[in-house]
């Protein structure tokens, strides 16, 4: 159940990766890649202050405010062989414990090695086997062939294209991708 993971988020493992919540000690690994402009090419913006100075991500700007438990899942992608955080994958904007959005980023030096596909597959499997979420969805700029390919390889279905829509901070054409629990279960049964 989703409610089982409101405060403590799990660590997931794949053959090459660990997916775990980020901790302040990860700031050095994050600093090496998180502010690189090529990550945000299709987002229409540069890296934010928190992305340029990742240690700020771990400081609560209003510690006196009581926070609600966070239903979102935000994992750092850790390469086992180096123990470095090389990216992140998130399931966020969870609505009514039924559906959520998918996002991911990776160190540009490691693009093309299948790490995001491996991480996203693990995240999707966790969501559909341990929570009641029934749908995951994502958007990707039509020009971002690598991101669109990741979603396709993970079983997401192209549901349509928005023309001249706003995605993050830019107006562009972007694809909408979706994956239903029943489609994922059917895909798992045939592989």
Each predicted region: which residue ranges?
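Short, Lys/Arg-enriched C-terminal cap helix and immediately downstream tail that follows
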Residues: 135, 163-164
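Conserved GNAT acetyl-CoA-binding A-motif
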Residues: 130-139
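Short histidine
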Residues: 140, 147, 159, 171-173
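Conserved acetyl-CoA-binding loop of GNAT-fold acetyltransferases
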Residues: 152-162
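Conserved acetyl-CoA-binding loop-helix of GNAT-fold acetyltransferases
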Residues: 104-106, 112-129, 145-153
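GNAT-family acyltransferases
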Residues: 1-109, 130, 164-191
